[in-house]
UniProtKB/Swiss-Prot annotation:
Region (Disordered): 45-79
Keywords from the named record: Cytoplasm, Elongation factor, GTP-binding, Nucleotide-binding, Protein biosynthesis
Protein name (Swiss-Prot/TrEMBL): Elongation factor G
Family listed: Belongs to the GTP-binding elongation factor family. EF-G/EF-2 subfamily.
Single GO term (MF): GTPase activity
Protein residues bound to GTP: 17-24
Basic residues: compositionally biased ranges: 62-72
Taxonomic placement: Bacteria, Bacillati, Bacillota, Bacilli, Bacillales
Underlying gene: fusA
Annotated organism of origin: Geobacillus stearothermophilus
Record carries keyword DNA damage: no
Localization in the cell: Cytoplasm
Length: 79
């Protein structure tokens, strides 16, 4: 099966930090400000938009991965 997106613009990033250091919050903001999600979920309200969070946390795992496609254009916050 042929790829449906170009690898030329693909970037891999990793976020590593201590427990409760803000990894999910950082990921939420990256997805929001790059336009991948249109609403920010709040971790302290157990409503993060990033899939896999609740399953991972309940299983005691703090390691997650998710593939996202992005056009490389970030939006700036005006607030």
């Amino acid at each position: 099966m042929a790829r449906q997106f170009s690898l030329e613009n693909t970037r891999n990033i990793g976020i590593m930090a201590h427990i409760d250091a803000g990894k999910t919050t950082t990921t939420e903001r990256i997805l929001f400000y790059t336009g991948r999600v249109h609403k920010i979920g709040e971790v302290h309200e157990a409503q993060p938009r990033w899939t896999g969070w609740s399953k991972s946390k309940s299983a005691g795992s703090r390691s997650r991965r998710r593939r996202q496609r992005h056009n490389g254009k970030a939006t700036a916050s005006t607030s």
